[in-house]
């Protein structure tokens, strides 16, 4: 049996995307046709194992962009759906909608159940508020060359006093000496790889050397907020959450074309709207430039050795496909260094693009540049065949239908 998730298509048109309701066992098993397929992820907790304790005392916010109509219908979420809320959920949903981003903490058993319902549809999200010092997170920083960036990164991480593991991915001798000096100066443990294997293998080495139940991965060109782990760690109190990431924005210092581009189109910046990271939404993947992961939700090794680029996307997609929840919390912001060299800019994008074919092979139909709706295709087709009046009529119908769904505001 198939269920359909309504997705926003081209120019605000709406299309239906079928999703098979597969069992958890089917979702967690790797594709046997894949050569060197990664090991299956551990199964996520059952409803009983998950429980409800994680919601108690947790302030929630209404997710921006989600419409709430007639006291019972929501439009939006992740994945994007039109939902008629159960009667038991509506009173708390109304209160939370009115509170907005100011937040509201569920107080009764009924409100706790309603909160979980809203969280699981991406209609609400937990607000990232620190609850005190964190003692169950290790930080892993992979680095290759770029010792100066690492020094800034380690200085920013010092504020929370967490254990830090630096993994030098076989940097040249001069860089390696400076990396070792920086690690020692900040009290970080240093692992030196004998051979360069790429960021995924470096992260895996750091992950294996850590012992904490949660591991924060931070790229060496990141300048972290002073309390980013303390604020994001409570979101992992939900046993179903495998990973959570902050927003990563470009640290723009100048006005060059590359810097201005990075400020508005950085591949690491997933936007300002919180989201569950699932197929078919704007935040459909997360980079590991800054992310906290649950050890119990990862495979061994966590990052696929066969992927030198895109291994972070692969892991997040495998988590989603296995039934885990991955959250994006942009209220917390880290900054990444902008490299202004045109050569570096082009090389990085060529590198990212190089992972597309392998990711598509491992996750068929997830890596699609555009998902136009039938109405959108109708508009483009009419224009292509010289029928602007028909194109205008289709576009007008789509616009009117969307306005009816979303309401006047």
Give the positions of each predicted feature.
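Short, flexible, basic/aromatic active-site loop/helix in glycosyltransferases
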Residues: 246, 262-283
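Glycine-rich, basic loop-to-helix element that forms the pyrophosphate-binding segment
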Residues: 193-210, 274-281, 318
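Acidic donor-binding segment of Leloir-type glycosyltransferases
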Residues: 155-192
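Acidic, low-complexity/disordered tracts enriched in E/D and polar residues
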Residues: 16-98, 120
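Catalytic donor/gating beta->alpha subdomain of glycosyltransferases that bind UDP-sugars
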Residues: 313-365, 396-409
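Short aromatic/hydrophobic "clamp" motif used to bind/position activated sugar donors
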Residues: 215
């Amino acid at each position: 049996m198939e269920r359909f998730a309504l997705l926003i298509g081209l120019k605000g048109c709406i299309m239906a995307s079928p999703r098979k309701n597969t069992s958890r066992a089917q979702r967690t098993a790797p594709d046997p046709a894949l050569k060197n397929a990664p090991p299956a992820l551990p199964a996520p907790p059952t409803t009983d194992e998950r429980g409800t304790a994680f919601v108690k005392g947790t302030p929630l916010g209404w997710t921006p962009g989600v419409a709430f109509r007639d006291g019972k219908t929501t439009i939006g979420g992740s994945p994007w759906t039109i939902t008629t809320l159960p009667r038991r959920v509506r009173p708390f949903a109304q209160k939370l909608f009115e509170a907005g981003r100011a937040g509201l903490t569920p107080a009764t058993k009924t409100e706790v159940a309603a909160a979980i319902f809203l969280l699981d549809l991406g209609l609400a999200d937990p607000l990232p508020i620190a609850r005190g010092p964190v003692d169950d997170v290790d930080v892993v920083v992979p680095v290759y060359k770029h010792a100066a960036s690492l020094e800034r990164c380690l200085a920013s991480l010092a504020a929370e006093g967490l254990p830090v593991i630096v993994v030098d991915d076989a940097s040249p001798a001069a860089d390696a000496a400076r990396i070792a000096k920086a690690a020692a100066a900040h009290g970080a443990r240093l692992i030196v790889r004998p051979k360069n294997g790429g960021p995924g293998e470096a992260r895996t080495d750091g992950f294996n050397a850590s012992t904490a139940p949660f591991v924060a991965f931070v790229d060496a060109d990141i300048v972290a907020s002073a309390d980013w782990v303390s604020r994001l760690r409570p979101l992992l109190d939900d046993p179903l959450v495998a990973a959570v990431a902050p927003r990563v924005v470009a640290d723009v210092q100048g006005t060059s074309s590359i810097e201005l581009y990075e400020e508005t189109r950085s591949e690491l910046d997933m936007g300002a709207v919180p989201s569950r990271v699932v197929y078919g939404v704007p935040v459909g993947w997360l980079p590991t430039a800054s992310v906290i992961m649950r050890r119990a939700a990862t495979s061994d090794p966590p990052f696929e050795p066969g992927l030198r680029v895109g291994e972070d996307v692969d892991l997040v997609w495998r988590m989603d496909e296995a039934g885990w929840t991955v959250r994006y919390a942009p209220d917390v912001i880290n900054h990444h260094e902008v490299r202004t060299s045109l050569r570096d800019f082009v090389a990085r994008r060529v590198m990212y693009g190089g992972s597309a074919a392998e990711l598509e092979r491992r996750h068929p139909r997830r890596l699609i540049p555009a998902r136009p709706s039938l109405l959108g295709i109708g508009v483009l087709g009419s224009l292509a065949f010289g029928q602007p009046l028909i194109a205008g009529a289709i576009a007008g119908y789509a616009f009117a239908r969307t306005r009816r769904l979303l309401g006047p505001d």
